[in-house]
């Protein structure tokens, strides 16, 4: 069968609802560093453009020390990486659509602001990694 189409998917909020695990990681960092936790709706408005930007949006003017910001962002990434698929779930209909695309010989790839290794880990843990021919994450193409 000839391949005619390719679909490029975003990951967070398109294929997978990652907000609960992002919130857990964010609030872990806030507790650890003595700051106020956020609610799920707040986290959804902060997400996008990667962990550094998400944490910067959360800090706003509250935290001015760049070293502390970097420590908090590192803690976020470390915690999130260890807990990436605790509550994250496929968005309704995604599994059926991926199966349909595979049957129709549609090639598929993922492009995300997550680092590539976190994206691959999440896709593997939720058991959809094998649908994709390529996963491009933050910094994936830096060496090209």
Predicted features and spans:
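N-terminal helical cap/lid subdomain that shapes the substrate entry/recognition surface
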Residues: 2-95, 100, 104, 115-117, ...
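Short active-site oxyanion
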Residues: 105-109
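Anionic-ligand binding region
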Residues: 120, 124, 135-140
């Amino acid at each position: 069968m000839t391949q005619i189409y390719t679909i490029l998917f975003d990951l967070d909020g398109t294929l997978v609802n990652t907000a609960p695990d992002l919130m857990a990681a964010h609030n872990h960092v806030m507790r650890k560093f003595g700051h106020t936790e956020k609610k799920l709706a707040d986290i959804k408005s902060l997400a996008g453009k990667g962990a550094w930007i998400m944490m910067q949006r959360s800090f706003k003017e509250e935290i001015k020390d760049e070293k502390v910001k970097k420590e908090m962002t590192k803690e976020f990434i470390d915690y999130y990486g260890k807990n990436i698929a605790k509550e994250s779930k496929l968005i309704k209909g995604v599994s059926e659509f991926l199966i349909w695309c595979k049957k129709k010989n549609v090639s598929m790839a993922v492009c995300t602001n997550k680092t590539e290794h976190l994206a691959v880990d999440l896709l593997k843990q939720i058991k959809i990694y094998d649908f994709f021919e390529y996963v491009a994450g933050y910094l994936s193409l830096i060496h090209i």
